Amino acid sequence: MKLRFAPSPTGLIHVGNARQAIANALYARRHGGTFQLRIDDTDRERSRDEYVDALHTDLAWLGITWDETFRQSDRLDRYAAAIETLKASGRLYPCFESEQELASKREARIRMRKPPIYDRAMLRMTAEQRAQAEANGKVPYWRFRLSDQDRGVDDMVMGRSQVKLQSISDPVLVRADGTVLYTLASVVDDMETGVTHVLRGEDHLTNTGVQIDIAEALGGKVGQFAFAHLPLLLDEAGGKLSKRFDGLSIRALRQDGIDPVAIVSYLARLGSADDPAPLSFDDLAASYDVRRVSRSAARFDMRQLLALNRRVMHQMPFGAIRDRLPEGATEAFWMAVRGNVDMVSELRHWWDVVGGVIVPPVQDDEGAYLLQALALLPPEPWDAQTWKDWTTAVRDATGRSGKSVFHPLRVALTGEEEGPEMRDLLPLMGHDRVAERLRIAAR
């Protein structure tokens, strides 16, 4: 068994691309198969090496590893051989229409209430007419002549469907500049590298019928590939996700402090009957079943991802977060703040609270109380019992009770109305910092 993820390096991958990569990698891991990373860089104008590098970085950060990888730009000779095979069999034919001419034809067919598909006019050109067109400086592009039959697709998600090739335009496989399009390159790669299962987006379902037709024209067997087409992933507003919407790129989520475990766990089960839970890649793979994915479009909900990320953070051991903590942060710090951190990006704030510089709000009506508390502040060393001992002494001396004892002290020392347990924060702050903040807040 072999599966592949074949992104084009024309932008940063977003959660929609990542969902497909995760599905392929999990399915391969679940069934002991091979996972191939294929870079679809045949679009020479839009493909960028920087996006290839970003792709590798993002997938590695998500914990997705691949068994083999290559660029389609390194296999142009194989596509050229396939082109010659299709030309020799008469399935690939030259076309000379301009974009304007094609647009006029489409408009005319629409006016006649006919499907706006290609009319195959170039199939009726004689050899002399073709030679004359080339002599006049026209350079052909090349279309694949689809067969006149339906192509059945047994899909693990969508079920059985029929692609009516008669209602589809013969696809362009080679541009006038000689560039090979993905439609052909993908088929050649799948056949020659032994891909057995194709998991991709629902928007490729019609294209699957076309590619089956191309594969058979190149000598492929009927039923050579198993297919699973995942429903489209929509944004929160119900629109289609775009590579150019950077807010949901994997890079942006990483920079925002979302943990990769949360992203993979969320996307792996999005659109299925399984509730997302923070699981390792191996645990997700052990139970992964693409047949549990609903046929309906799934909506990416940032609130659900943040809720899952919160669970991940609250359970994370020190060893797993150590490298992402602010410099100098200890295990005691992490254990103190872990329950109040939803994203890695929030750690800097709490590190400043316990060991940096903050400006606590002045509490004019609590000044006298804070100075009384300062006078009762015990000497170090401090431990988890110090907060209780100190506030008990303050309560007894002032006659206060409940929130009126604790709240002014928390605000003075952290600048926050709520947060981690003060019994855990106090020893991390130290006597001098606590005393200074009490004086500032009492002004």
Swiss-Prot record:
> Which annotated residues bind ATP?
243
The UniProt gene name for this protein comes to: gltX2
Gene Ontology annotations for the cellular component aspect, listed alphabetically? cytosol
Question: In its UniProt entry, what is this protein called?
Answer: Glutamate--tRNA ligase 2
Matching SUPFAM superfamilies: An anticodon-binding domain of class I aminoacyl-tRNA synthetases, Nucleotidylyl transferase
User: What is the role of this chain?
Assistant: Catalyzes the attachment of glutamate to tRNA(Glu) in a two-step reaction: glutamate is first activated by ATP to form Glu-AMP and then transferred to the acceptor end of tRNA(Glu).
**How does the record describe its quaternary structure?**
Monomer.
Motif 'HIGH' region — list its residue ranges: 7-17
Taxonomically, the superkingdom here is Bacteria
**HAMAP family, alphabetized:** Glu_tRNA_synth_type1
Supply the alphabetized keyword list. Answer: Aminoacyl-tRNA synthetase, ATP-binding, Cytoplasm, Ligase, Nucleotide-binding, Protein biosynthesis
Q: Name one Pfam family in it.
A: Anticodon_2
Residue positions of motif 'KMSKS' region: 240-244
Please state the Enzyme Commission number of this protein. 6.1.1.17
What are the recorded GO MF terms, alphabetically? ATP binding; glutamate-tRNA ligase activity; tRNA binding
Question: What's a single GO BP term from this record?
Answer: glutamyl-tRNA aminoacylation
Q: Which family does it belong to?
A: Belongs to the class-I aminoacyl-tRNA synthetase family. Glutamate--tRNA ligase type 1 subfamily.
Reaction equation(s) it catalyzes: tRNA(Glu) + L-glutamate + ATP = L-glutamyl-tRNA(Glu) + AMP + diphosphate
* Matches recorded under InterPro entries: aa-tRNA-synth_I_cd-bd, aa-tRNA-synth_I_codon-bd_sub2, aa-tRNA-synth_I_CS, aa_tRNA-synth_I_cd-bd_sf, Glu-tRNA-ligase_bac/mito, Glu/Gln-tRNA-synth, Glu/Gln-tRNA-synth_Ib_cat-dom, GluQ/Sye
Q: What is this enzyme's class at the first EC digit?
A: ligase
Q: Where's it found, cell-wise?
A: Cytoplasm
